[in-house]
Amino acid sequence: YFPVSPYAFCAGNPVNLIDLEGQDIWEINSYGNIVRHLKTTRSDAFFMVDEYGNRMIGDNYSIEFPYKTVVQQNSYTYLDDEKGINSYDVYRVRGDKNGTALFEFLADNITGSPTKVEIGQIMTGLEGDKGLNFITTSHTERREAGLMKLIRGQIGYGYTIREVNHSHPKDAFPSGLTGSDEQGNGGDMEAIKLLTNSMISCGAKVASFHIYHVPTKRKIPYSVKS
């Protein structure tokens, strides 16, 4: 699920830690942390690494995109109620197919691992090759704080948000349907209600919301009426 941020929709701005341009290689561990970052002008690529930092073997553990597909990578810090100071990573990816491919690659390898760390995807702008996708992770088991914080802290202002997706390691339904999730929060249902109301109050079209269910690789829609 993605917990609620204290940042107001259409306002607020977290602290920017890292601002990296594209044309890179990223080596990522099962928590979604960037273990190594290598500069290259050949392509944009991601490799999963094991607990020792070694690249994992197999076609499912790497993905490659044309040069400058990843427009930018940023990391932000925030105060988490449970973990204290925490951070979340954001990859800005050009093109809906590319953004979805990276989102599902990271979800399959990270959310689908024993860490159960969730991944988020925000699809903005024009649909198709010109769309700008934001792929997020806050490196936390069964939670994705980056989605909510990014929307309410930055891209809720000045971006047309078309779709908001996040991964689930097990449940094929949104958290919070019974009032609270395992952590005692309103979970996905509280978040979608707040975001929907915020979009309406800002005069924006309400985005569509989906869960990417990793065990079945299905994209499951949900709404405030779920």
Predicted regions span which residues?
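Acidic glycine-/aspartate-rich tracts in secreted/extracellular proteins
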Residues: 14-15, 41-42, 127-128, 168-172
